[in-house]
UniProtKB/Swiss-Prot annotation:
It comes from Mus musculus (Mouse). The modification N6-acetyllysine is found at residues 21, 348, 510. One of its GO terms (biological process) is protein polyubiquitination. Its EC number is 2.3.2.27. CDD domains: RING-HC_RNF20. PANTHER family: E3 UBIQUITIN-PROTEIN LIGASE BRE1A, RING FINGER PROTEIN-RELATED. Residues 1-37, 128-153, 507-620 are annotated as: Disordered. InterPro entries: E3_ubiquit_lig_Bre1, Znf_C3HC4_RING-type, Znf_RING, Znf_RING/FYVE/PHD, Znf_RING_CS. Component of the RNF20/40 E3 ubiquitin-protein ligase complex that mediates monoubiquitination of 'Lys-120' of histone H2B (H2BK120ub1). H2BK120ub1 gives a specific tag for epigenetic transcriptional activation and is also prerequisite for histone H3 'Lys-4' and 'Lys-79' methylation (H3K4me and H3K79me, respectively). It thereby plays a central role in histone code and gene regulation. The RNF20/40 complex forms a H2B ubiquitin ligase complex in cooperation with the E2 enzyme UBE2A or UBE2B; reports about the cooperation with UBE2E1/UBCH are contradictory. Disulfide bonds: none annotated. One of its GO terms (molecular function) is p53 binding. This is E3 ubiquitin-protein ligase BRE1A. It catalyses: S-ubiquitinyl-[E2 ubiquitin-conjugating enzyme]-L-cysteine + [acceptor protein]-L-lysine = [E2 ubiquitin-conjugating enzyme]-L-cysteine + N(6)-ubiquitinyl-[acceptor protein]-L-lysine.
Amino acid sequence: MSGIGNKRAAGEPGTSMPPEKKTAVEDSGTTVETIKLGGVSSTEELDIRTLQSKNRKLAEMLDQRQAIEDELREHIEKLERRQATDDASLLIVNRYWSQFDENIRIILKRYDLDQGLGDLLTERKALVVPEPEPDSDSNQERKDDRERGDGQEPAFSFLATLASSSSEEMESQLQERVESSRRAVSQIVTVYDKLQEKVDLLSRKLNSGDNLIVEEAVQELNSFLAQENVRLQELTDLLQEKHHTMSQEFCKLQGKVETAESRVSVLESMIDDLQWDIDKIRKREQRLNRHLAEVLERVNSKGYKVYGAGSSLYGGTITINARKFEEMNAELEENKELAQNRHCELEKLRQDFEEVTTQNEKLKVELRSAVEEVVKETPEYRCMQSQFSVLYNESLQLKAHLDEARTLLHGTRGTHQRQVELIERDEVSLHKKLRTEVIQLEDTLAQVRKEYEMLRIEFEQTLAANEQAGPINREMRHLISSLQNHNHQLKGEVLRYKRKLREAQSDLNKTRLRSGSALLQSQSSTEDPKDEPTELKQDSEDLATHSSALKASQEDEVKSKRDEEERERERREKEREREREREKEKEREREKQKLKESEKERDSVKDKEKGKHDDGRKKEAEIIKQLKIELKKAQESQKEMKLLLDMYRSAPKEQRDKVQLMAAEKKSKAELEDLRQRLKDLEDKEKKENKKMADEDALRKIRAVEEQIEYLQKKLAMAKQEEEALLSEMDVTGQAFEDMQEQNIRLMQQLREKDDANFKLMSERIKSNQIHKLLKEEKEELADQVLTLKTQVDAQLQVVRKLEEKEHLLQSNIGTGEKELGLRTQALEMNKRKAMEAAQLADDLKAQLELAQKKLHDFQDEIVENSVTKEKDLFNFKRAQEDISRLRRKLETTKKPDNVPKCDEILMEEIKDYKARLTCPCCNMRKKDAVLTKCFHVFCFECVKTRYDTRQRKCPKCNAAFGANDFHRIYIG
């Protein structure tokens, strides 16, 4: 511990050691060691040789001294680190020990009922650590055990006393402190035992049956608790006050610590600069020593002669002037002085650093042990004290209200418990009902599952039966589809016939309208038979197509299972349709030719029969009557077709094909009757025209008409034959169709029976599913009812809780309102006035405090800046003085008249100057071979590379930053 206060004493021998060594080395060099000087011609040469040897020895001694200094410095740094760690550990132990003692003291005052709180106040003063002495290094201090009894005695730092005392005194003091902490712990144990005895006595009195003893015990306990409450309240006030003062002091000391740290950083930067300068000077000195040693070795080895005033070269001899040696010695002395000055500056900076660290530690100690009495004098503390007294009175009132509320709470709890018991009983009964219903539903569900299994088995059996009857059904469906295709083809042919009929009717109407005169009646009679044969031709073609379609249908029924034959049949039908279209085109061309001929005849007859215009009008009236009759017939046929369509729509699918065939047969018969009627009409017209016309032209026309009639009669006979063939084919197809229908009816009956069985199974399955769904719905409804009952119970419980809370709130509000109304109304006006005044004062004080704090911070910043600038100016001033003294010496040497050099000396000086310019200013050893492209300063490549690698990427002369691409080599020839 003696090393804590004696840091400077340890550092002083380090400064005084090197000079002693120097003298010792000099003495040894002059007395002990023998020097071989070689051949000497004069006393001056002898002096020069001796000086050279001394200089060499001095350089060696300087190197030894520097090595010793480095070792000592490292040793001192290690000791300082060790001492700092020891001090830190001691400070931590002392801090926690003092905190332990303080906590024990507070606990004793908390539980020691015999002493008052005034003793604690005196003890608290003793706990405060004052400002440490200037020669102490401790961060936290502690009072001795003697200071506990007497709080007004001056308090000394425990660590400072330990540092100033001997080892025996240290042991005795530490033993005393340990004994004091032991005594404090034993006191805590005794106090705890007393409290335990008192509690046991009170519990015995309370457990005894006598009412008087119980009342006494309760009164005693109340008084004890009231005293304890008062003591605790005072203790909390004291601790809060202490915390407040400590926080304020902490803020102040934190600012001081920040300023000290900034100063320390400035000093550290200055120390680094000085260390850099010292290293630079040392390197220069070493370089000079090496150079001097090399020169001396050359002189000794080659036997160069040295003359006092000569400066020329004589056949292998080099003349060295004695003045140069003097100059070199003077430079060496200057460098030594510079080194001593730098060393002194470093020592001063180290002392300043130590002082700053001690101040920093003192400030930390002050921060941890701030004065607590200042808080009591502040208006904020007084205001808080008054507010605390008001709040304490209010707390007493609230306690009374709380007792009343507790009584009400016990009553409401009893009622609430009764209600809860009733609700629980209802819930248990509902649970029982629900269980019975759930059991019933499960039984019904099991029955439904059994029925479902039975139905599933039956359904599988029916499916197997249906799979057996599957191929028969497929064959029937295939036959039905083929018949449907045949029916579709017949429908297409019927539609085609209808279209042809309409075209024929439209052509008829056109031809009848064209016959405009009576003279053209004969022509029209000739034209009608021309048209009729075309119509007959078309009808015969239609009948032929109809018969071919029937034949194709029979082939389809026979060969329905063969797809290749169907394709051939389609191909044949397409070929037939193409042939029919070709025939129709040929017939149209013939009709066109006939129409052209008839038009020519009309043109020739029109000129002759203009006079017979009146007869033509009568014939036109007859033609109109005939057209009206035909219109009526067409309307009747339309009605018949509508009836057939209705019958076809109302008929089932099995009979639709039959209906189509019957309709086609009726239609063909009606067309035959129409054709016969037309034939009769034409014959009648022919007879009438034969009677009327006797001319040669009429005879020619009659002959032509007769030819046409013969042609038509032949065609009619052909049509009759085809009709008879078609009727026979129709009978055959009808019989085949009836057979197929009977088979279809049988198969349909079988299908219906199977469908009925399937429908029965499906209906039973649907019924079972419906029953299952109903049971599920009933179960869900019961679950919903249970949930609703639970939610109702929860809601009732919440309502009860809310009502209880409302009761508590209302009762507390009523009690507090009645008691506080009177007091609050009286104190409200006074408090308002005081609050307004206090708020105004607080605002003013806050504004003043903020302004003062701002000014203080500004002043502190300015002081720090001024101190930094002053230190920098002093440093620059010292450097400038050193430069001035060095330059003065040079000036004095240059002003001397005896020192006027000769030409060789001037040349040598110039060479030296050029060499100095070409050598790197950083290391002063290597040549300049690298340039910085940012500022164009020249150095050696090794120095620039080391600066770049060590991240000191600034120019040594102008501090301009440079990067990897901002320097390169140059070659000076």
